[in-house]
Each structure stands twice: as structure tokens, then as C-alpha cells.
Amino acid sequence: MKPRTTAALAGATIALAAITAAAPTAHASTHTYSNQRGDVRCEIYNTPQGHTTLCVSDKARKAHPECNPPQALIPAVKVEDNWVGTLCWNQGFTQPPQKLSPMSVRSGGGATVFAAPGGDLFVLDTIKMALIQVGSATKVLFPGF
């Protein structure tokens, strides 16, 4: 190969490697957790549009009959920059959750998640300073500032 061709090929390879290495960073600010059974899940993510904490619970179906049938909706609680509340969610998460054993705590993406012994998750959204509970019911314990 000629030196120019080799340099161009090396440059293209380096550029492709840089693009490939940068691709996972799009999800680097996404943190997904669940209780040990996997029936209560939370995803915390940051985008250019803002910060979101979203938690869903299969356990809360009795407390939230408006969020049925199971194949279409799930009880949820959501924290965003300008809104905190409960709703029925109809989408999945972007990645599989990390299962938390009871009494464990994880932090990431602007939230701290505590796995309670009964399977509920308590989430302190440290960006909004909101406290939510998701499990047997979905609740906003403190709406934040």
C-alpha cells in the first residue's frame, strides 16, 4: 500500500472506532433498577430535554384498576423537571434492570433507589428532590421543588 492510502485507511479506522466508542454514551446516563422479583422497576435517565425518573409496578394493579389490561398499561409514577405524579404507562424500558436485593441502595442518574424488604422501591430523585414509592401502590410521598 502507498503511504497515503495507509494513512487514509488508518484515519478512517480511527474515526469509525471513535464513532463506535461514542455510541454507548447515549445510554450512559440511563440507570434501570428492579426489586428482586422484577415486578417493580425504575428507570432514571437524562436527555437534552431534561431529567426523568419513571417507575412502574405490576404489584399495584389492584390499587390502580384504571391501569389494566396488563398487556396494554401498567401503574406508574413519574418525576420530570416540571411534573411529578402517577399515571398509567404503556411503554417498556430501554435496558434490562439491575435487580436489587432487599435493603440495598443504588444511586445514579440523579436518583437514589432503596429496595424495601416487602418488594417496594423508594426513590429519592435528587434533581427534583422528590420522594416516590412504587410497589403495592404508586405514590408521590414528597413532590419536590
Show which residues each predicted segment covers.
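Acidic, glycine-rich flexible loop segments
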Residues: 91-122
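Glycine-centered tight beta-turn/hairpin loop motif at sheet-sheet or coil-to-beta transitions
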Residues: 37-39, 108, 127
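Short, surface-exposed binding/anchoring microloops in extracellular/periplasmic proteins
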Residues: 35-67
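A low-complexity, Ser/Thr/Gly/Pro-enriched, surface-exposed linker/loop concept
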Residues: 54-100, 130-145
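C-terminal region of N-terminal signal peptides and the immediate post-cleavage residues
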Residues: 19-34, 39
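Bacterial N-terminal signal peptides
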Residues: 10-20
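Bacterial N-terminal signal peptides that target proteins for export
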Residues: 1-11
